[in-house]
Amino acid sequence: NTVYGNVTIAQYAMALLMNICHRIDVLSDMYREACDEHKNVMMGRNLPRQIRQIELYEKTIGIIGLGAIGLCMAKMAAGFGMKVIAYNHHKKTGPEYDFVEQVPLDELLGRADVISIHCPSTDETRGMIDKNVIAKMKDGVILINTARGDIIVEDDLVEALNSGKIYAAGLDVVCNEPITGRIPLMD
């Protein structure tokens, strides 16, 4: 929960996911640079990996942390036709959660095509996403974190990104903020 808007943060998390899936940043630059390249993209010719399109419809999103922000993200994902599963330390009850399948964390890790983190930084969650947890994730998973940077062990994330275990990560937080120099995660 935030002072400046639970919906705003969930929308930002969804925007990170949409940019990963549809490379809006790359395509926007390409459109500005060359009409011919735009035609090649639209015709599906020579589509490089960095602008590969990923369809979200019928994919499974796993939400870690089903508080106000996590619930907003779940609703948005459902609006895109995604199957929504979630893990929360304490099971959530009430009609607003009926569309969410609440599962144990290990099950979420093995089933989710996208994992979006929306839990607070606590003794239990600090360093929670490490190489052991990443190993339980589906190959090629997309990871979104708009919660707290210290929930993910950055060196383990870098290794998983480099190996392809994690296809891409959308982050607006890192372990040590503010960033004062180049960090391996940016490479």
Q: What residue ranges belong to the model's regions?
A:
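Phosphate-binding beta-alpha-beta segment of Rossmann-like dinucleotide-binding domains, i.e.
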Residues: 2-60
